[in-house]
Swiss-Prot record:
<dbReference type="GO" id="GO:0051301">
    <property type="term" value="P:cell division"/>
</dbReference>
<keyword id="KW-0131">Cell cycle</keyword>
<comment type="function">
    <text>Component of the kinetochore, a multiprotein complex that assembles on centromeric DNA and attaches chromosomes to spindle microtubules, mediating chromosome segregation and sister chromatid segregation during meiosis and mitosis. Component of the inner kinetochore constitutive centromere-associated network (CCAN), which serves as a structural platform for outer kinetochore assembly. Fta2, fta3 and fta4 associate with the central core (cnt) and inner repeat (inr) region of the centromere.</text>
</comment>
<dbReference type="GO" id="GO:0005634">
    <property type="term" value="C:nucleus"/>
</dbReference>
<keyword id="KW-0995">Kinetochore</keyword>
<dbReference type="GO" id="GO:0031511">
    <property type="term" value="C:Mis6-Sim4 complex"/>
</dbReference>
<keyword id="KW-0493">Microtubule</keyword>
<dbReference type="GO" id="GO:0000070">
    <property type="term" value="P:mitotic sister chromatid segregation"/>
</dbReference>
<protein>
    <recommendedName>
        <fullName>Inner kinetochore subunit fta3</fullName>
    </recommendedName>
</protein>
<dbReference type="InterPro" id="IPR008426">
    <property type="entry name" value="CENP-H_C"/>
</dbReference>
<keyword id="KW-0159">Chromosome partition</keyword>
<keyword id="KW-0137">Centromere</keyword>
<dbReference type="GO" id="GO:0000776">
    <property type="term" value="C:kinetochore"/>
</dbReference>
<keyword id="KW-0498">Mitosis</keyword>
<dbReference type="GO" id="GO:0051382">
    <property type="term" value="P:kinetochore assembly"/>
</dbReference>
<dbReference type="GO" id="GO:0005829">
    <property type="term" value="C:cytosol"/>
</dbReference>
<keyword id="KW-0539">Nucleus</keyword>
């Protein structure tokens, strides 16, 4: 059954509903039976169901020009009342707004997916950074420990060397003091003896040794 046949049958069904339950059902002065909420609700549901199907078929057949279709205009005119008019307007508004709704929804879904991708990328990058930190630590730690041990050993040896040098300097100072005493005594003896040390090479050599020495360890 094509769309035209379906539309024809549904139009007949809708008109039959309207014939069985005239427009006074939704008028301002309903009858006793028409006040029954269950009956009214059932009738509204039936009309709404037919109207939704009709509207969908008209949209498939006529597209955006549905309101300019002659058959649709006749049906709309025959069923013009507060209930059907409201239903039609609501359906038409909803159908027109679907494009405006779907676009933000699709964009929101896309942004959510992109956000998840970014969060996943950040998490992965953070994990990689932590791995690199651990790798750097594993490579540098032995070197740092080795350098630290070398510095401690050097500091220990430097302290030992300094102590040894200080001991040597102390011995040199003592030797220098003793030498000064011997030099002074020797010079006095040679000068007081009246012997000319210029004519005696050995005495000249001794006097030369007793001269002022350039080495002075007092500054150490």
């Amino acid at each position: 059954m094509d769309n035209n046949d379906q539309i024809s049958n549904l139009c007949l069904g809708a008109l039959q509903l309207l014939a069985d339950q005239p427009i006074s059902v939704i008028s301002n002065e309903p009858s006793e039976e028409q006040r029954n909420e269950h009956v009214l609700k059932k009738w509204e549901n039936n009309v709404l169901r037919h109207w939704k199907i009709l509207f969908s078929l008209f949209m498939q057949t006529c597209g955006d020009s549905v309101q300019g279709n002659a058959a649709f205009s006749i049906l709309n005119f025959m069923t013009t009342n507060s209930l059907v008019g409201q239903l039609y307007q609501r359906l038409y508004d909803e159908s027109n707004s679907l494009g405006f709704i779907s676009s933000p929804l699709n964009e929101t879904e896309h942004l959510s997916e992109e956000n998840l991708k970014i969060e996943s990328s950040i998490t992965f990058t953070s994990e990689e950074i932590e791995k690199e930190k651990e790798n750097i630590k594993s490579v540098l730690l032995p070197s740092v420990q080795s350098i630290s041990s070398s510095l401690e050993l050097y500091a220990s040896k430097e302290s030992d060397y300094r102590s040894s040098i200080e001991g040597v300097l102390a011995d040199l100072k003592l030797a220098r003091a003793r030498w000064e005493i011997v030099r002074n005594v020797t010079q006095i003896l040679l000068l007081e003896s009246g012997i000319s040390f210029l004519e005696n090479k050995k005495l000249a050599y001794i006097m030369d040794l007793c001269g002022d020495r350039e080495d002075n360890y007092s500054s150490y």
